[in-house]
Amino acid sequence: MSLLSAIDTSAASVYQPAQLLNWVYLSLQDTHQASAFDAFRPEPTAGAAPPELAFGKGRPEQLGSPLHSSYLNSFFQLQRGEALSNSVYKGASPYGSLNNIADGLSSLTEHFSDLTLTSEARKPSKRPPPNYLCHLCFNKGHYIKDCPQARPKGEGLTPYQGKKRCFGEYKCPKCKRKWMSGNSWANMGQECIKCHINVYPHKQRPLEKPDGLDVSDQSKEHPQHLCEKCKVLGYYCRRVQ
């Protein structure tokens, strides 16, 4: 055994890992050839000792025959191959064995399963300037998006959700025609005179005192036949304040 260990350590120090793997494959191939050769050996006669037991009892010329030398070579190569394969595969795997690899993968799976895609904490709302009035409740201290009277996003059909009349801007999604009206109400649309479909405003501003475009719009006759508010009420909607 001391001779085998000396051979193994000297071989491991001389050969590179790739050469060691080739050596292992060659040794395994030699063992397969030896086992195939043993399959064709004749059956021992009755009363004769097995060749393994009679190996040490042979004459010196029999011990030096090619058959016995091949057995010795295959035995030594098999021992070297097993030792080298154990050392190579232990050094090649960072986990040491397949069981350790499976344990490492399971731990990684559990680690990634714990990671959930959570939205970041909502940043505190920015305070508006001191003189800023909310466009919905007309109080100071918050923007319209933080107004307590505002409906949740997606419920209303118009930007404005109050009860006052607004100045709204419209754009027909079919013909792309744009127009403005000083008779815009919350969740009420106007009919496009070209496509005859109901269009909701994409911009609204409550009317306190008309100015700018609102003044010019006030001088025009209100198209009651196109106003959804007038259709719902059944009379001129501007009388409702």
UniProtKB/Swiss-Prot annotation:
Pfam families in UniProt = ZCCHC24_C (PF23490), zf-CCHC_2 (PF13696), Zn_ribbon_3CxxC_2 (PF17180)
Which portions of this protein are annotated as coiled-coil regions? Answer: none
InterPro entries attached to this UniProt entry: ZAR1/RTP1-5-like_Znf-3CxxC, Zcchc24_Znf-3CxxC, Zn_knuckle_CX2CX3GHX4C, Znf_CCHC, Znf_CCHC_sf
Entry keyword set: Metal-binding, Phosphoprotein, Zinc, Zinc-finger
Would the keyword Zinc-finger be found if you checked this record's keyword annotation?
Answer: yes
Q: Carries keyword Phosphoprotein?
A: yes
UniProt name for this protein: Zinc finger CCHC domain-containing protein 24
UniProt gene name: ZCCHC24
